From Swiss-Prot:
UniProtKB keywords: ATP-binding, Chaperone, Cytoplasm, Isomerase, Nucleotide-binding
Catalytic activity: ATP + H2O + a folded polypeptide = ADP + phosphate + an unfolded polypeptide
GO MF annotation terms: ATP binding; ATP-dependent protein folding chaperone; isomerase activity; unfolded protein binding
Enzyme class: isomerase
Biased composition, class Gly residues, residue ranges: 538-547
Free-text function comment from the UniProt entry: Together with its co-chaperonin GroES, plays an essential role in assisting protein folding. The GroEL-GroES system forms a nano-cage that allows encapsulation of the non-native substrate proteins and provides a physical environment optimized to promote and accelerate protein folding.
Family: Belongs to the chaperonin (HSP60) family.
Protein name: Chaperonin GroEL
Record gene name: groEL
The keyword Metal-binding belongs to this UniProt entry's keyword annotation: no
Binding site for ATP: 30-33, 51, 87-91, 415, 479-481, 495
Main localization, broad class: cytoplasm
Region (Disordered): 526-547
GO cellular component, one term: cytoplasm
Length: 547
């Protein structure tokens, strides 16, 4: 086992603090509308330029192992805030730095670290409940645009694009961000339920010019098994032929005689039919077939439920306005399922997402949720160079997360104002002793840090602006982009409550742990021994006798 280097007390805390400050100072320059860029060196290719706090934090590794521990703990704050709310990483880092700096000063002055931590925790709990009181719902597209714009570093086109996407696919819809091919940002929306399964035979194609199958007002048969015998399908095919509507068959597989007969019937015009495989595998396939049956108001024919395909009737079939099938995808548009049933199914899937522990399962459940909710939107980011493209894509993803967070928990006035107002409201709370009171004051002072940093990055005097904001009430704050004071909500400067809340909670949690640190242990660096057995380099080895 390698030898360890151990540091105690103040010596350990000073080293840790140095690491915290290096990381936080690099991250905080990106905060606010006039935040600066950070250039990150890459081992290959051009350096990347970013204004995204978490991207900067992830790049930082320090040579001194004790300092690096401090930096890594703050990095954890940024990553946690990013995972939960998708944004607020810079705010979280800044809050953690402010609490740690003030807290360690108090420890050095002889305060009890445990009581300081209790005071900080008490202030954070009270601040979070006040934030919830201050929060207002974010429901209209104007507010969504504003939140997206602020999070994308005042890029209005991004805010508008996200708002449009949410309007088209609903707040639960899936919105993905991709690198575009042009200079302009684009929005592409796939309406209805789409899954990755194409037609089983090209002979089903009825639109040869585009190579797709299009069915208007079709019946939809969903079967949870492999079909190879045409006899099982004959009764339902006859019933559909009489109704003169097209039919889509979704099954585990369709092969042999059954597929050949369907192709012949389709080509002769006896019945307009198309067949596709069911999406997914195993239990997920059953669940997705169930989703389709709810969306189209049909019944899933399943042998597990002792249902017989031969005995199925038109009542068992689902219906939709239109179905479009390509080589690789099937899209069911405007299914005739009842809104109430679909809503219940969505609630059920949301519950499963909350209970799921696997990221992969969560991702798949979210996909199902989106397909039921009304579609998928793809934001294609345009830029002139690859460096700009990567930077912009990261900003758009941040803005998208922030907007989702805003819809979920509402918004508070932005620009650091919400935390200042919350700190004013809880300024009278007291702990059980004087050391806890100091902890509370440390947290309250730290809540001013985001506003001070936004002002500092815009080139103004932080103390003057902070005092002016404190003298105001409600949403009154400072707009760093235009250098004016006023109502932050009217300025359109909004922060999602979830982002501000999680930044404060994680910063308070990790900062409390750092203040109560008394000992740090790390591996001693290995000394590289010089190898004395290597002969002096005086020429080519083995050729001494030729001289």
């Amino acid at each position: 086992m390698a030898a360890k280097d151990v540091k105690f007390g103040n010596e350990a805390r000073v080293k840790m603090l140095r690491g915290v400050n290096v990381l936080a100072d690099a991250v905080k320059v990106t905060l606010g509308p006039k935040g600066r860029n950070v250039v990150l060196d890459k081992s290959f290719g051009a350096p990347s330029i970013t204004k995204d706090g978490v991207s900067v934090a992830r790049e930082i590794e320090l040579e001194d192992k004790f300092e690096n521990m401090g930096a890594q703990m703050v990095k954890e704050v940024a990553s946690k805030a990013n995972d939960v709310a998708g944004d607020g990483t810079t705010t979280a880092t800044l809050l953690a730095q402010a609490i740690v700096n003030e807290g360690l000063k108090a420890v050095a002055a002889g305060m009890n670290p445990m009581d300081l931590k209790r005071g900080i925790d008490k202030a954070v709990i009270n601040a979070v409940s006040e934030l919830k009181q201050l929060s207002v719902p974010c429901l209209d597209s104007k507010a969504i645009t504003q939140v997206g714009t602020i999070s994308a570093n005042a890029d209005e086109t991004v805010g508008t694009l996200i708002s449009e996407a949410m309007e088209k696919v609903g707040n639960d819809g899936v919105i993905t961000v991709e690198e575009g091919t042009g200079l302009e940002d684009e929005l592409e929306v796939v309406k209805g339920m789409q899954f990755d399964r194409g037609y089983l035979s090209p002979y089903f194609i009825n639109k040869p010019e585009t190579g797709i199958v299009e069915l208007e007002n079709p019946y939809i048969l969903m079967v949870d098994k492999k079909i190879s015998n045409i006899r099982e399908l004959l009764p339902i095919l006859e019933a559909v032929a009489k109704s003169s509507k097209p039919l889509l068959i979704i099954s585990e597989d369709l092969e042999g005689e059954a597929l050949a007969t369907l192709v012949v019937k389709s080509m002769r015009g006896i019945v307009k039919v198309a067949a596709v495989k069911a999406p997914g595998f195993g239990d997920r396939r059953k669940a997705m077939l169930q989703d389709i049956s709810i969306l189209t108001a049909g019944t899933l024919i399943s042998e597990e439920l002792a249902m017989d395909l031969e005995k199925s009737t038109l009542e068992d079939l689902g219906q939709s306005k239109r179905v479009v099938i390509t080589k690789d995808t099937t899209t069911i548009i405007d299914g005739s399922g009842s809104k109430k049933d679909i809503k219940n199914r969505i609630s059920q899937i949301k519950q499963q997402i909350q209970e799921s522990t696997s990221d992969y399962d969560k991702e798949k459940l979210n996909e199902r949720l989106a397909k039921l909710s009304g579609g998928v939107a793809v934001l294609k980011v345009g830029a002139a160079t690859e460096v700009e493209m990567k930077e912009k894509k990261a900003r758009v993803e941040d803005a998208l997360h922030a907007t989702r967070a805003a819809v979920e928990e509402g918004v508070v006035p932005g620009g650091g104002v919400a935390l200042v107002r919350v700190a004013q409201k809880i300024s009278k709370i007291l702990g059980q002793n004087e050391d806890q009171n100091v902890g509370i004051r440390v947290a309250l002072r730290a809540m001013e840090a985001p506003l001070r940093q936004i002002v500092s990055n815009s080139g103004e005097e932080p103390s003057v602006v902070t005092n002016n904001v404190k003298d105001g009430i409600g949403n009154y704050g400072y707009n760093a982009a235009t250098d004016e004071y006023g109502d932050m909500i009217k300025f359109g400067i909004l922060d999602p409550t979830k982002v501000t809340r999680s930044a404060l909670q994680y910063a308070g949690s990790v900062a409390g742990l750092m203040i109560t640190t008394e000992c740090m242990v790390t591996d001693l660096p290995k000394e590289e021994k010089s190898d004395l057995s290597v002969p002096p380099q005086g020429g080519m080895g083995g050729m001494g006798g030729m001289m």
